[in-house]
Design a protein with these regions (language model features):
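Short hydrophobic/aromatic-enriched beta-strand-loop microsegments
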Residues: 54, 120-121, 149
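N-terminal start-of-chain detector that recognizes signal peptides
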Residues: 25-27, 100-101, 119, 167-173
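Conserved SAM-binding loop
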Residues: 1-114, 127-144, 154, 194-200
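A generic fold-level signal
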Residues: 7, 122, 190-192
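Short glycine/proline- and charge-enriched loop/turn segments
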Residues: 114-123, 162-169
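A C-terminal cap/extension of S-adenosyl-L-methionine-dependent methyltransferases
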Residues: 147-200
Length: 200
């Protein structure tokens, strides 16, 4: 986050913050943090556990607060109209603000290996699925430019192991396919199971 934003501290918003561990970690490094989550249970958990401010999507959409960094860690694919959120995020970013989006990549080696059994399809919870090309198009249509892309190397193993389990395959086969996916991503990052997009 610090490398991507060029800031050691600032104001950060995490959309789809879940249990709040990322927010708490960033708070400990000196960031002012806020979360958004659709789950009232999650909002209460984060508030009670970490004493952090977490808004509902409706409350956030109606606010006008500005942030130096907005993060979406595997949350954009759960949103019915992700372009609406991206448009709103753009209005919430400071002039030099950064958007960080992590998404499953269905062009990955493990996605091709497992086909419809690929765990990261996660239907019906995942409403949209992205490639680097489709992400570039939606980002551009919402006024963003992708500055860089980064691999989430562990996801090659994690998603492969989950996929193997869902398909009744062995744990070892999941690890092996995860290794193959990880190795292929070493030579071509667009083969990685999940990618992080840094946008401005």
């Amino acid at each position: 986050i610090e490398k991507s934003s060029g800031n050691r501290s600032g104001k950060l918003l995490d959309i789809g913050c879940g249990a709040g561990h990322f927010l708490q970690a960033m708070k400990k490094t000196g960031w002012i943090v806020q979360g958004v989550d659709v789950s009232e249970k999650a909002r209460k958990l984060v508030s009670n556990t970490f004493n952090l401010d977490v808004k509902s999507p409706l409350d956030w959409l109606s606010s006008d607060e500005k942030y130096d960094v907005v993060t979406c860690w595997h949350s954009l694919e759960h949103i019915h109209e992700p372009w609406v959120y991206l448009d709103k995020i753009r209005t919430h970013l400071n002039p030099e603000g950064v958007l960080v989006v992590a998404l499953p990549n269905y062009n990955s080696t493990d996605a091709k290996r497992y086909g419809s059994g690929w765990a990261a399809y996660d239907t019906p919870r995942h409403l949209y699925h992205f490639t680097t090309e489709s992400m570039e198009k939606i980002a551009s249509s919402c006024g963003f430019s992708i500055q860089s892309m980064h691999k989430m190397n562990f996801d090659s193993f994690y998603v492969s192991i989950l996929s193997a389990r869902h398909m009744g395959k062995s744990f070892i086969s999941g690890v092996l396919n995860g290794f193959i996916s990880w190795l292929s991503a070493m030579f071509n990052r667009e083969k990685c199971s999940s990618l992080i997009y840094i946008m401005k």
